[in-house]
Amino acid sequence: MLMPKTALALLQLPPATVAALEKLGADLAVARLRRKESLKTWAQRMGVSVPTLQRLEAGDPGVGIGIVATALWLIQRDGELGMLAAPEHDRGAIEMDVRQAVELGRARDRAAASARLRAARQKA
């Protein structure tokens, strides 16, 4: 029997990300239990198998994003999905933009100083 391949990306997840997925899964399990839904009923509502739901609730990073989105939709938290990677929250890209702007400002300052120096030499 062939074993399914595990994507290298899933094996390289940082521990903090693995912990976040496990917490998300546990929180989704709590949400299901608070609604007094069985694994079987909740899985049917999601359109997945019970083992897939169990993997989701265990924080398995191999569970598809569509399944995660469906679970969030069932607990009315899917609206947050659109903000997860919103550009205005991308701290790394914002920091890069700031560094580039600072460097551009420095380059312009150097160019202006060089131009002033050339102009002063031409007058002399």
Task: List where the protein language model places each region.
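Short, charged/polar surface micro-motifs in flexible loops or helix N-caps
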Residues: 77-80
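N-terminal flexible/basic segments that precede or flank functional cores
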Residues: 1-20, 84, 88-124
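Short alpha-helical DNA-recognition segment
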Residues: 36-54
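Short basic helix-loop element that most often maps to the first helix and adjoining turn
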Residues: 26-42, 104-106
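Short acidic/histidine-centered micro-motifs embedded in hydrophobic/aromatic stretches
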Residues: 45, 71, 84-88
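Short, basic-rich loop-to-helix N-cap that marks the start of a DNA-contacting helix
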Residues: 60-74
